[in-house]
Amino acid sequence: MDKKLARIRRATRTRQKIKELGTTRLVINRTSRHIYAQIISPTGSEVLVAASSVEKVINQEFKYSGNKEAAAFVGKIIAERALKKGIIKVSFDRSGFQYHGRVQALADNAREAGLNF
């Protein structure tokens, strides 16, 4: 089993468990250059809030958007946008990525900004 397939299998298991809980989920996707975060409804049919390092606000702030500092800023922005919409409690879906580095920075700053997970 290769690395990508193993990550996808972990992500599928996590999503299934979160679906059983029936809560909104904070989904992370990571590429080598950017990081994306979305808060998805319990049914999975609509994106309630989104933020990514591709956005102009973040792109102008950082020289390179594929680092921990940019991920931390995305975490802060996603939490602020969620709180404006009245979303406080979410389940963290790291999409099979290891809880380390950019994923951890995003999660920690989202918690500091007021999201509970």
Swiss-Prot record:
Q: Can the keyword Ribosomal protein be found in this entry's annotation?
A: yes
Q: Which keywords belong to this entry?
A: Ribonucleoprotein, Ribosomal protein, RNA-binding, rRNA-binding
Q: Does the keyword Chaperone apply?
A: no
- Cited InterPro entries: Ribosomal_uL18_bac-type (IPR004389), Ribosomal_uL18_bac/euk (IPR005484)
Where does it sit, as one GO cellular component term?
A: cytosolic large ribosomal subunit
Origin: domain of life: Bacteria
Instruction: Please give the HAMAP family that the UniProt record associates with this protein.
Output: Ribosomal_uL18_B (MF_01337_B)
Family membership, please give it.
Belongs to the universal ribosomal protein uL18 family.
Query: What is known about what this protein does?
Result: This is one of the proteins that bind and probably mediate the attachment of the 5S RNA into the large ribosomal subunit, where it forms part of the central protuberance.
What's the protein called, per UniProt? Large ribosomal subunit protein uL18
Query: Organism, per UniProt?
Result: Hamiltonella defensa subsp. Acyrthosiphon pisum (strain 5AT)
